[in-house]
């Protein structure tokens, strides 16, 4: 389907529910799921306000004026999600999609120096020919690495990825003491030090606790992303 009923769209989408018609653009199949992505056209029209109508938003995108992770995207339905880097070519403005307590996901202005950097969470690993390991990331990206490097990087760890050179710049293990941020659920946007993990049979459902000052928030392991050893390795908050 090309469209989605407004009333069925994810609650965090910045669209009116009872105005603007019955339908809204549905994200095309891609790197992020419907629940955790926003169509590129809605970002241009409803978030950044570069367009007043869907027709104008589609025109801007079709002209190649918008890049996602350094690649020109001409599909107005392209799904944009967590940690994606959006660049408006004519103005040079660059934004990162970050978890936010109020908006669920928000666009954070970043410098052009950071435009080539992206945090990726490892969702799984597989062995491939030649005794190498392929890493699977949260944005659908895959990367083949050596057996030695692949063994060190665990599922749910994060890596700092160089979009231009297509290479890992840093490895951030998800372990006690690491700085992490909640990326889904009711505590989305909360960041702090990971100070407790209660393991369960289903690893994704293990309970973790993040602490920031005197405040403690608990969520499940699947909702947490490591962002740095002592602090975020890139800008993820204002």
Curated annotation (Swiss-Prot):
SUPFAM superfamilies: Alpha-L RNA-binding motif. CDD domains: KOW_RPS4, S4. It comes from Pyrobaculum aerophilum (strain ATCC 51768 / DSM 7523 / JCM 9630 / CIP 104966 / NBRC 100827 / IM2). This is Small ribosomal subunit protein eS4. The gene is rps4e. Residues 38-101 form the S4 RNA-binding domain. The keyword Ribonucleoprotein applies. PROSITE patterns: S4. Gene3D superfamilies: 2.40.50.740, RNA-binding S4 domain (3.10.290.10). Belongs to the eukaryotic ribosomal protein eS4 family. Disulfide bonds: none annotated. InterPro entries: Ribosomal_eS4, Ribosomal_eS4_central_region, Ribosomal_eS4_central_sf, Ribosomal_eS4_KOW, Ribosomal_eS4_N, S4_RNA-bd, S4_RNA-bd_sf. GO terms for cellular component: cytosolic small ribosomal subunit. It holds the Pfam family RS4NT. Keywords: Ribonucleoprotein, Ribosomal protein, RNA-binding, rRNA-binding. GO terms for molecular function: RNA binding; rRNA binding; structural constituent of ribosome. GO terms for biological process: translation.
């Amino acid at each position: 389907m090309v469209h989605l009923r407004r009333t069925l769209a994810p609650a965090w989408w910045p669209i009116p529910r009872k105005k603007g018609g019955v339908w809204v653009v549905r994200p095309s199949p891609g790197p992020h799921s419907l629940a955790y992505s926003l169509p590129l056209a809605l970002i241009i029209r409803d978030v950044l306000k570069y367009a007043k109508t869907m027709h104008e938003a589609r025109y801007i995108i079709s002209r190649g004026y918008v890049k996602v992770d350094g690649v020109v995207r001409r599909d107005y339905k392209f799904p944009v999600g967590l940690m994606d880097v959006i660049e408006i070519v004519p103005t040079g403005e660059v934004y990162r999609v970050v978890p936010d307590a109020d908006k669920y996901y928000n666009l954070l202005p970043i410098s052009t120096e950071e435009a080539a950097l992206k945090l990726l969470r490892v969702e799984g690993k597989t062995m491939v020919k030649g005794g190498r390991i392929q890493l699977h990331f949260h944005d659908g990206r895959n990367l083949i690495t050596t057996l030695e490097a692949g063994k060190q990087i665990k599922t749910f760890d994060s890596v700092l990825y160089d979009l231009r050179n297509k290479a890992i710049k840093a490895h951030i293990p998800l372990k006690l003491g690491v700085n992490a941020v909640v990326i889904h659920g009711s505590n989305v946007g909360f960041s702090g030090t990971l100070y407790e993990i209660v393991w369960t049979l289903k690893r994704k459902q293990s309970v973790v606790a993040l602490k920031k000052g005197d405040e403690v928030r608990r969520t499940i392991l699947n909702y947490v992303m490591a962002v740095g050893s002592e602090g975020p390795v890139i800008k993820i908050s204002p």
